């Protein structure tokens, strides 16, 4: 179990798609350290499939790269994971499937995303983890949405909201 201050809840939310309604799962996890945030990433990694896209949402310094370090560890990545702020994408190929870690902070639209070869990365059968997803949201339909929020009262506390369907409903935390 992650930390004594961990809490989780599941909420059913209705999503309209093609005039059919589907139930999706939403889970919130509270962590009290970067290590706990990484541990949640490791748990998520165990459920990932080739071609999955993770769309991160959260302010600067919220813990998106820390979460990705855990994700990478859970995929068996042996390289050091760093923020792709200046490179736009970092590739990690040593795990059970490739991990492509994108930072879209400097991009203005999905058009920019396609200019850097987005479709080529998708075709490679790995996991795409996308920071600053709000900048390219229209290209990320069907993505697993992970929102990381800082607690204004405690700089170490994060609330991680995972929206990705039933596959992520039981993380064993």
Name the predicted role of every residue range:
Residues 54-56:
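Hydrophobic anchor at the beta1->P-loop junction of P-loop NTPases
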């Amino acid at each position: 179990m992650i930390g004594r201050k961990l809490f989780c809840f599941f909420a059913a939310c209705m999503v309209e798609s093609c005039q059919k309604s589907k139930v999706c799962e939403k889970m919130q996890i509270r962590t009290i350290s970067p290590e706990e945030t990484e541990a949640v990433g490791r748990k998520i990694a165990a459920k990932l499939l080739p071609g999955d896209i993770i769309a991160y949402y959260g302010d600067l310094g919220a813990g998106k790269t820390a979460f990705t370090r855990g994700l990478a560890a859970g995929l068996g990545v042996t390289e050091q994971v760093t923020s792709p702020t200046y490179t736009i994408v970092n590739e990690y190929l040593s795990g059970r499937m490739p991990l492509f870690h994108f930072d879209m902070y400097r991009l203005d639209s999905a058009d920019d995303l396609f200019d850097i070869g987005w479709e080529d990365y998708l075709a490679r059968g790995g996991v795409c983890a996308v920071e600053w997803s709000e900048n390219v949201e229209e290209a990320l339909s069907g993505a697993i949405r992970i929102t990381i929020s800082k607690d204004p009262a405690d700089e170490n506390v994060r609330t991680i909201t995972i929206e990705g369907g039933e596959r992520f409903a039981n993380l064993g935390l």
